């Protein structure tokens, strides 16, 4: 066989091969290209279960306690390919659950355990997730047995709970309901660093949407900032990272100590022995990564973090030894066999059992960040209290662990299973119980009273949008249910100023109707949409699902809800002062949080503009002479080549559209508006509605997208 005729897959042909998805990508040429593709993630085309699959219904068929028993059996069924420390995978499964949940950040609500993302890159290959590929594979026989009745996302967290329970610990409870997705969440910004373990400063972390001090870590470097080995300097980094998950000092101490009461770290030898992570490993590794050439590569020779630390005398049984050892001994810095900085109790006896040889004992060891709980003054106070009151520690850890593993699930209405705690917790955004569903007659009566108020279409629609559009698909917070637009902090938001003026009039109707204020607000928006459609020549009824309730101020964590404001709401042409991110980028961010597709985004912007819903009443993007009519004027005028656009100043935030021949100013617009003419994908969608046959389709699509947003938080309708 000549060289020219050799098989192109044999490795002997040096010619580059043309492959699907290969070649130079668009983002190479245009690195600032708008990521409209983020709105089309997790489509039906990537989901093997089909659009009719209902996880909540499947879970109800599950023998929950049989599942728990099977997971518990896995804990002590040590496998030769990854032998269990002390014959028990308790520590490994706790770490699996912790690291699945620990990517959550309250700033934008993204990350967390709710979608089973640890199965995919980058999380499956983060340095801090080394060896968790083994934990997931240990659970595969259980997942295989129970199939779609239990998601991977739920299984990860439940395995952590069962590991704790098997150690003798009493957990606070467990709520299922996390639905798997089938591809990575590419909308999550993990940071701009281009190297693993690149360091971030604590000031930049505080209040940011980043959840770790270094790229590829879950929280902080266990060796201290930049591996400094300084416990005191680690304190602000610990507070910043845990604070971005809404954890206070007591929860931080409880979580660190509780997580380090069981199990161990692994650092038998230099990281030079460790090969590629799962995403970069050879195909024959079958999804495993971090192959280890040291000794057997597993068991006593395992290398994960490079640290070799065991905290407790009973590493598979719950105890208070973490705090007892922390305060009892004098700690001396040492290096692990892998060369990492850790600490050993210099004045202790060898009281720690070896994980594989019962004849060997070790001295207690700690991480640099463990010692922070002793040497930071505020953490030390809490730690001493837990030292002297083990039950208080256990209670605090149980609650903090539950919060850690459920924080991204949204309201308790989403929880499934027999172990859901009865207690309502403020971070769950609790709501009162719903009363009787209003009758059709009472809904019709309420609609008539709304019409009688004489409010404009824009006023009605703006109020409903302001109420519903706080929803975040990441952590399922916000939305119209609860009518929290009537409460602090939303009532005081600048962007809601005009909406609140309308709200005061809707509030006056509540006493004379059978509807909650939350329902009245949405119904008012529906009335506005119906009036606008009728004015455009289409008689439609906007679907309305009553049953919303009104939250109390005491059920609303003001600081936590303030985060739902975000940086911009391009649907209302609002952008927070001082924010430099281009408005169109923030519009995509907002649309993605609202779980909108690109066509839904396009329809909503076009409709909201012609209905006159800008937050400040401005005319930016209102490309029509018939404000309040659900027409396609936004699209036809945007794409009209008789108009020419130019920025009004050097900021390029606001633009004037002039008649190309006369120079007369016809319209003004923001970047949120013009992007539907400038971006090739959004322009293609805008053209659909600007066509002569696009009017009816536009009304139908707008109503469908509108109804979707109004019901985003109606988990009771699923």
Swiss-Prot record:
Family (UniProt): Belongs to the peroxidase family. Peroxidase/catalase subfamily.
Task performed by this protein: Bifunctional enzyme with both catalase and broad-spectrum peroxidase activity.
Keywords linked to the UniProt accession? Heme, Hydrogen peroxide, Iron, Metal-binding, Oxidoreductase, Peroxidase
Annotated GO CC locations: cytosol
**Protein name, UniProt field:** Catalase-peroxidase
> Tryptophyl-tyrosyl-methioninium (Tyr-Met) (with W-98) cross-link position in this chain?
219-245
List residues binding heme b. Answer: 260
What residues does the record give for site: Transition state stabilizer? 95
Give the position of the cross-link Tryptophyl-tyrosyl-methioninium (Trp-Tyr) (with M-245).
Answer: 98-219
Q: Which organism is it from?
A: Acinetobacter baumannii (strain ACICU)
